[in-house]
Amino acid sequence: MPRRPPRVCSGNKPPPVPAMEPATDGLWAHSRAALARLEKLLRCSRCANILREPVCLGGCEHIFCSGCISDCVGSGCPVCHTPAWILDLKINRQLDSMIQLYSKLQNLLHDNKGSDSKDDTSRASLFGDAERKKNSVKMWFSPRSKKIRCVVNKVSVQTQPQKAKDDKAQEASVFEFVSATPPVVVSTRAKTASRTSAKKHPKKSVAKINREGNFRPETRDSRFDSKEKLKEEKVVSFSQTLVMENSRVNGEIDLLASGSVVESVFSGSFAEVSLPLAEHIVSPDTVSKSEEAPEKKVCVEDRCPVGSDGNPKGCHRPPTSTSKKCGSNVPSASGEIREPTLLAENVVLVDCSSLPSGRLQVDVTLRRQSNASDDSLSLSPGTPPSLLNNSTHRQMMSKPSTVKLSSGIPARKRNHRGETLLHIASIKGDISSVEYLLQNGNDPNVKDHAGWTPLHEACSHGHLKIVELLLQHNALVNTTGYHNDSPLHDAAKNGHIDIVKVLLSHGASRNAVNIFGERPVDYTDAENIRSLLLLPEKTDSFSTSQCSVQVNTGQRKSGPLVLIGSGLSSQQQKLLSKLETVLKAKKCAEFDNTVTHVIVPDEEAQSTLKCMLGILNGCWVLKFDWVKACLDSQEREQEEKYEVPGGPQRSRLNREQLLPKLFDGCYFFLGGNFKHHPKEDLLKLIAAAGGRILSRKPKPDSDVTQTINTVAYHAKPDSDQRFCTQYIVYEDLFNCHPERVRQGKVWMAPSTWLISCVMAFELLPLDS
């Protein structure tokens, strides 16, 4: 019997190398083979294509494209038939990022120069396949409301028929379904009926509901092609807590956290609607028809287009009340017309709380680590069709929207992160959309909830063209974002040397520090970038100040004018009241956040509470000569000539540059009694200056106190006061003085120093 050869190799013979069959000859053959194996792992379990927006049903390990499971939502896995609730749907963000990296690597290995590696491949292919797929599902999460939202869209390939000009055109039917638990009052008439009597009455048929809602019956003159077309154009509205309708009958399923009612108005013309985002695809045929028939519009801004018979087109009166949050323009039972916020086709709202599942837990991650934003916004109906057909614009519209804007109004609506359309376009690198939004009056200096501006986003993602475009439209180059990071911090941190050069040429400050005291040069190891950032500054502060004045002058003068006097005599108060009538302004007796102008009698600012609050809020602090000049000319004069110099001017420029407040990063503890400056007034000043109040006296010898790594933003760079963030304030106008403390992060400071800092709008040095 022959001996079995040993399974281990001897030390003289090297172990066999795993066989790797190269896909093609030439360079990187093994990498191509490995990429081919990776491609097999990134395929959908149903369509066997590369995953597009991968999702899992939660009950099994199979992963599908979002468009492949539209008919399986809420039923089960199409492969292993494992039951799955609709709330178990999860988007695999990590796998989506891996697919995008795979696509970029494939383009590099195969020398595919035609494709743009910067574009989002999965999203671009999704729009390309939208006309070949009938159903697509979209899920995303709202970290703030801890809810999931799901939209199943049915995209029609064939061209939408135009509505006939006569009054016999087909209209959509509106049906209403009310859930059994909890009982919901549907209309004004239904409020009079008792809830117990609802059980005695049988369910109403669809035809009866249509008759009660004064809907016209369907005629044989309809120009729709098939019965299925009629099903797709029915609008179904639900109340509060609801059951889910079949996704095959309704084109869109929307799981909102609000659980409110939305009724969508259907019109035969698709000329002007709220643009759908991402998979709400507007076909080119539909867009072309909107150009041919611009007079046919959906009800917008409390008015409806009038048809040939004198009746409003597309304005039904369903017998349900709508939620204020949804803001629908559908007429209610009382006859009110409300503005629609969603598309006029197949909208179904379902409350997540009605579905049989536990509390939804959603992981909230940092925005900059996410691959794409969860919620985006829609453009106004006045967007030109050429921009709608642009692929980059469609990539910007990557998620379903809850915003509808009328034409000519800047897109000021935000998603749950506070991002506007300009933020989304800057993140995605959509140059055409950024240019369009800026030309239509969008503010380039708007901040989201974290403090980022569109310039921050463009610098962080390396979009040089968008950075130049924003700077051309007077974007502030030194404004701070999250943790007081400037755009130069973001550009240096991500190694974008071209953007660093552009920012420096527009006056970006090299010495700007964030909340941790780090400059832009501290965030990069690249020698070419460090050499640029280590150059001495010359006129950066002057250039940025001049830029901010030019940017905000027009915006400031277009706003309301609110006046308040400080230290004025009775005669001066009468003249100020007269100026109120001349300029159609408002005069306040007490200071609030709406005040724009503080009038003082002479060339020095008053140390009154009104004047100091005006300084801290960046108001115009003007001499009384401005009032006389305005009364003489009977119009508003330029404020710059009459502004009190020093602290008031520095504060106003600081506000126009959107920089942090005076006491940003500082903490205060008020110890002892305060008589000359009341404690309540000091608390108001500290809060208005961005400082924080400590309820306990800080301990200088505490390791926790001394290890705080934040700095004061407005302290001088070469001063040790920058690292002092906790102040113990005492009253120093009396003979009794507490023991002085000046140890590390904790310093003792008199109340007069606090007042002097406010008047000068700078952190003055403390005497040792």
Curated annotation (Swiss-Prot):
The keyword Phosphoprotein applies. It comes from the Eukaryota. Residues 1-20, 188-226, 307-334, 370-414 are annotated as: Disordered. The keyword Nucleotidyltransferase does not apply. Its main location: nucleus. Keywords: ANK repeat, Cytoplasm, DNA damage, DNA repair, Isopeptide bond, Metal-binding, Nucleus, Phosphoprotein, Repeat, Transferase, Ubl conjugation, Ubl conjugation pathway, Zinc, Zinc-finger. GO terms for molecular function: protein heterodimerization activity; protein homodimerization activity; RNA binding; transferase activity; zinc ion binding. Residues 544-548 are annotated as: Flexible linker. ANK repeats lie at residues 417-449, 450-482, 483-515, 516-536. Residues 373-391 have a biased composition (Low complexity). A zinc finger (RING-type) spans 44-81. GO terms for cellular component: BRCA1-A complex; BRCA1-B complex; BRCA1-BARD1 complex; BRCA1-C complex; cytoplasm; nuclear ubiquitin ligase complex; nucleus. E3 ubiquitin-protein ligase. The BRCA1-BARD1 heterodimer specifically mediates the formation of 'Lys-6'-linked polyubiquitin chains and coordinates a diverse range of cellular pathways such as DNA damage repair, ubiquitination and transcriptional regulation to maintain genomic stability. Plays a central role in the control of the cell cycle in response to DNA damage. Acts by mediating ubiquitin E3 ligase activity that is required for its tumor suppressor function. Also forms a heterodimer with CSTF1/CSTF-50 to modulate mRNA processing and RNAP II stability by inhibiting pre-mRNA 3' cleavage. This is BRCA1-associated RING domain protein 1. It comes from Rattus norvegicus (Rat). The gene is Bard1.
